[in-house]
UniProtKB/Swiss-Prot annotation:
Naturally occurring in which organism (per UniProt): Danio rerio (Zebrafish)
Function: N-alpha-acetyltransferase that specifically mediates the acetylation of the N-terminal residues of histones H4 and H2A. In contrast to other N-alpha-acetyltransferase, has a very specific selectivity for histones H4 and H2A N-terminus and specifically recognizes the 'Ser-Gly-Arg-Gly sequence'.
Keywords linked to the UniProt accession: Acyltransferase, Cytoplasm, Lipoprotein, Myristate, Nucleus, Transferase
Known EC number: 2.3.1.257
Protein name: N-alpha-acetyltransferase 40
Main enzyme class: transferase
GO cellular component, one term: cytoplasm
Amino acid sequence: MGRKSNRAKEKKQRRLEERAAMDAVCAKVDAANKLEDPLSAMPVFKKYDRNGLNLQIECKRVTALSPDTVEWAYELTRANMQTLYEQSEWGWKEREKREEMKDERAWYLLARDADSTPLAFSHFRFDVECGDEVLYCYEVQLESKVRRKGLGKFLIQILQLIANSTQMKKVMLTVFKHNHGAYQFFREALQFEIDETSPSMSGCCGEDCSYEILSRRTKYGEVSGHAHGGHCGGCCH
């Protein structure tokens, strides 16, 4: 009876430790979501004036954006991505994409010109993936006239800084394998790696999947390590 009792106590203790660790992870995500402006401590990144561009950068919750701005973001995403979605097993689903982009958890990093016209954006969220607190980048979309000027890389670098400052362990995103330019951009220019949760790594469907999940650890994440065995998916809502 003594050995059984000890095993039960150890099992209970492990559960308590795992729950405490997950509570700490969710507390960080909740704290990040309560920020008014994640860029407030990084004013130097609130403008982009390189390669002929002079843009203002802002970071807001979707609830703080005008309906016109959200509609512009959707239409730009549709124009840039619909064909790529239709070439995948997902297909293009307008209602689902609109709901995703309007979800109250959504944050937007926006680049506007001198007339306040939006020209590029990233939709991201603070969330939990497999026990880790992460910044998940859902979209990074640019109008054609501001592409190939370093702006996309700049926006992703801002996301990495925001992730580190809010103690997220990594920046994650999903990219289609057949979107060769984007795949090369993230893997080579930004040094993202194929995440351990990606189908090709986890063995769930591998080569049959049209996408990879990529990630890059923050400085905070490199120091703090990984919470193995955590639940995959959001836990804080």
